[in-house]
């Protein structure tokens, strides 16, 4: 078995948060190691058109943007590793990371940038049209549905907020919910029910999403009444799935403090977690905004905080000698 690899900073995850953290850590001469994980590039690799990332006047492709971030991180000195961290031990110093390949890393600090995954319906037709009419982010993709008819699936705060946001663009928004009442906050429900652009279909679920192949686009959905089993079809230009997100916190479960929602809890105005030296950036800690640009900002914060943590530790060791 090879000897463990020592590092000042190990970054877990390769979305905007991870790569930005790597860029800043490398420029601080911390020689960071970034372990990409199971989906190099994060959620942007399944996003077709990106129109809201600063610096690009024209529409860019999500995978292309992540390629540029990876190249920049490597260019400034990040060691990028294609592997998956399967175990993170924070009770010891330095932290111990074990990878799927068997490689072991010993890190003085760790930046957790594992992200969060949107929960999907699990339909084959949903998978077929992801990025071509099926989305899990109204803020990202709502602009493309000006004067079109869209469907929002869900009944919590996220679904209601997405529906309200989409009324800025769509001509009609239909909320499909499998129950006969919303779980969303009352003030959000009041806004939704007062909006003339929004219609609600209760006790129903998406049974199938249909459309065209060349070019790929959604044209209609089939709904199933969960009480009667009755099937109906309705036209739709887009379907927004808003049934929640699942933060990728498996590595730190039981080791760091999590919010009730399951996201990593960080100190106010910080990326510091309840474990000194462990920082969380991006969607694994951000349950509110979940945008590429905010994830990048948190990655920057995490790297700067890791640098300060290491400097403080070095000063303390020097003073003790």
List each model region and its residues.
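Beta1-alpha1 glycine-rich phosphate/pyrophosphate-binding loop at the start
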Residues: 2-76, 148, 160-186, 193, ...
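Short beta-strand/turn micro-motifs composed of small residues
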Residues: 13, 36, 114, 154, ...
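FAD-site-proximal beta/loop scaffold in flavoenzymes
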Residues: 117, 122, 127-144, 243-289, ...
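A conserved FAD-binding loop/helix module that cradles the flavin
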Residues: 160-162, 275, 281-321
